Amino acid sequence: MMGEKISVIVPVYNVEAYLEKCVESILKQTYTNLEILLVNDGSTDSSGELCDQLAQRDQRIRVIHKENGGLSDARNRGIEEASSDLIGFIDSDDYIDEDMYETLYRQMLESNADLSMCGHYDVYHQIPEKQVAAIQTWELTPQEAIKMVMEAKILSVTAVNKLYKKELFEHLRFEIGKIAEDAFIMIALIHHCRKVVATNEKKYYYVHRENSITTQKFSLKFLNVIEAYEQNATIIRENYPELADVATMRLNWAYFYVLDRLLVDADFKDKVLEDRLIAYLKKNTKNILLDSRFTRARKVSFLALCLSRKLYTKILLAQTKR
């Protein structure tokens, strides 16, 4: 299929073991009118040299070497360098189905949307999840898309399994120096759309290198997750008041996310932060217990937290070892 050129931005940092598989999956796309921007973000392994070697294989590949600035900085550089009006992002340790961009472009064209999304596989130990049983496509208003993305049952906040009109980034960039960079920008991007189109068909393979939160050391950077969803809640409450409950739910989720990682790291202790996170969640007890989007297991463990954080931590550790 040949339509408008798509600029595919691939930030590269110390991924010599994964990069070739990622790039090969892009080169094999049935949608061939691509510009592939490999943004080498100051790699200290052989990734930079590998980028140059890959560029010799296909004239559609362009390599940008820069000093290390992080994932967001590399993506932003790619946006600035992109020569087309359509943009996609792929993380360099992931890979895609051969018709992902054909699917995203076709549904964008047919629906006259500004943003096109597909589903993704979570890949653990090189084994992907199953494809969805019933493939569906939706044409969505920004409000409908925000609801589906925030609920995260079908669509996700991730930047990578999507095709964007470049004009969406006219006044928006990825936040530099923070984790959860996708969560900081996605709701704002959707808010600037006239229409969004999405399919639940999985076309992107999101590779997880670590399978357990117990292997991750806690960092105060995890607080960026709360910051991102506070920012999203502000956008939603100001522009989509009907979705206030979704904003509240996702903010509660963010507090759980940070608290869980803090409690399972035996080497990091911050009683003041623990108390602040728990106090926020307890203040939202009614919202948590009455929201059907929280699982029964989450609600039971939350009730345990209200009784004893030691008990909650034991439950958490038992769950993560399964």
Q: Where are these predicted regions, by residue range?
A:
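Donor-binding/catalytic cores of nucleotide-activated saccharide
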Residues: L71, S92-V197, V207, N211-L220
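A conserved acidic beta->alpha catalytic loop
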Residues: S25, T32, N40-E49, E67
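Glycine-rich, basic loop-to-helix element that forms the pyrophosphate-binding segment
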Residues: K66-A82, S92
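Catalytic core of nucleotide-sugar-dependent glycosyltransferases
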Residues: K203-R209, Q216-L243, Y257-N287
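N-proximal low-complexity "stem/linker" segments adjacent to membrane-targeting elements
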Residues: M1-L27
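Membrane-interface aromatic/basic loop that binds lipid-linked glycans or pyrophosphate carriers
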Residues: V264-R322
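Acidic helix N-cap motif at the loop->helix transition within catalytic regions
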Residues: E20, L34, D45-L54, R77, ...
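Short aromatic/hydrophobic "clamp" motif used to bind/position activated sugar donors
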Residues: I87
